Regions:
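A short glycine-rich, Lys/Arg-flanked "PGG" loop and its adjoining helix->strand segment in the class I
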Residues: 132-147
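A short acidic, Gly/Pro-enriched loop at the edge of an enzyme's catalytic core
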Residues: 107-119
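Conserved alpha-helix/loop element of class I SAM-dependent methyltransferases that forms part
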Residues: 31-48
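Short, glycine-/aromatic-enriched active-site segment of Class I SAM-dependent methyltransferases
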Residues: 153-175
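Class I SAM-dependent methyltransferase SAM/SAH-binding core
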Residues: 53, 59-108
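Conserved catalytic loop of SAM-dependent methyltransferase domains
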Residues: 194-220
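C-terminal lobe and adjacent flexible extensions of AdoMet/dcAdoMet transferase-like proteins
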Residues: 224-272
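Short alpha-helix
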Residues: 176-192
Length: 272
C-alpha cells in the first residue's frame, strides 16, 4: 500500500478520489496522468457524449479518468502500450462502454477526418508534435471549432546550448524536445490552423513534478537533484489549448501516391 502518496491535493480535487495504488499501477511515465488531465480538462470544456481522442494515453489512466469525470467518449490511443492490457484496465474500471483502446502511431492514425470533438495529449506531445508539419496532420481529425489541448513536462523559458550547468548531468539529447508555453504558442499560432486560447504553466509545477517523482522513482537521483537545483527556473509543466479554425484549408494527408510504371529505355541511343 502507498496510502501516504501525495495525491490528496486541493489543486486536484477530482484526482484525489482515486486509489493511490491504482494510480501507481496505471502510470506509464514520469508524470501523474490524473493531475495533468484535470489541469488540462479545466480549459477544454469537455461535455458528456463528446468524442475525444486521448493521444499518447499510455496505460489509459487518463482516458478512464476523463470518462468517469466528464462523461465523454474516449479513444485511448497509444503506440508503446498494449491495447489489450488497456482494455483489461478499462473493463475493471467499469468504463468499457465509453473508453475504446486503440494501438496506433500518432503519425498514422486510423480515424476519419473530423471524427473528434476534441483532442487531448497528456505528457507525450513533445515526442512527435515539434515537427512543423504535425499540426497540419493532427487537425484533420478534430471538427472545426473543436479544441486541441496538450499538457506535460516543459520549460519555463527556452534552453540555449549548452544547457544550464545545474541541468547538465540530467540533460540528454532527447530533452531538446521540451519547450516553453510561449514556444508552443508560436509553433501553433503561425500556422493559422489553431486559434490558441490558453498557453500557460502550472503554478509550482516543478514542485508537483518533484514530489511525484520522489514517490514513484526515488532511485532516479539525477532527475530529482536536477529539479531540486532548478527550483522552477527552467523545469515545470506547460499547457496549451486552442480551437481549430474552420476557415483554414488543411493540406491533404498523403500516405501514398498512386503511380503507374512505364518502362522506358535507360540510356540514350547513339546518334547515327
Amino acid at each position: 500500500m502507498i496510502s501516504d502518496m501525495p495525491l490528496v491535493c486541493k489543486r486536484f480535487p477530482r484526482s484525489a478520489k482515486y486509489n493511490p495504488d491504482w494510480v501507481l499501477a496505471s502510470i506509464s511515465g514520469a508524470a501523474n496522468p490524473l493531475w495533468l488531465s484535470e489541469w488540462l480538462a479545466a480549459a477544454m470544456e469537455l461535455q458528456p457524449g463528446m468524442r475525444v481522442l486521448d493521444l499518447g494515453c499510455g496505460r489509459a489512466a487518463s482516458s478512464i479518468f476523463l470518462r468517469r469525470e466528464f462523461g465523454a467518449e474516449i479513444w485511448a490511443t497509444d503506440l508503446w502500450f498494449s491495447a489489450s492490457e488497456n482494455m483489461q484496465r478499462i473493463r475493471d474500471a467499469g468504463v468499457e462502454d465509453g473508453v475504446f483502446p486503440i494501438h496506433a502511431n500518432a503519425r498514422s492514425m486510423p480515424f476519419a477526418a473530423e471524427f473528434f470533438d476534441a483532442i487531448l495529449c497528456i505528457d507525450s506531445f513533445p515526442y512527435f508534435g515539434t515537427d512543423d508539419l504535425y499540426l497540419n496532420y493532427l487537425a484533420h481529425f478534430v471538427k472545426p471549432g473543436g479544441r486541441v489541448g496538450i499538457a506535460g513536462a516543459g520549460l519555463m523559458q527556452e534552453v540555449d546550448a549548452p544547457p544550464p550547468e545545474h541541468l547538465l548531468e540530467w540533460w540528454t539529447q532527447d530533452l531538446w524536445c521540451l519547450h516553453s508555453a510561449n514556444w508552443w504558442r508560436h509553433h501553433w499560432d503561425r500556422t493559422g490552423i489553431i486559434d490558441v486560447e490558453v498557453g500557460d504553466t502550472m503554478p509550482d509545477g516543478w514542485q508537483f513534478w518533484l514530489d511525484w517523482h520522489k514517490k514513484v522513482a526515488p532511485d532516479n537521483h539525477c532527475e530529482i537533484e536536477a529539479l531540486e537545483a532548478d527550483q522552477g527556473r527552467y523545469l515545470g509543466y506547460v499547457r496549451l489549448v486552442g480551437r481549430r479554425q474552420g476557415s483554414v484549408k488543411l493540406p491533404d494527408n498523403i500516405e501514398t501516391v498512386a503511380t503507374q510504371y512505364t518502362k522506358m529505355p535507360l540510356l540514350r541511343t547513339a546518334a547515327t
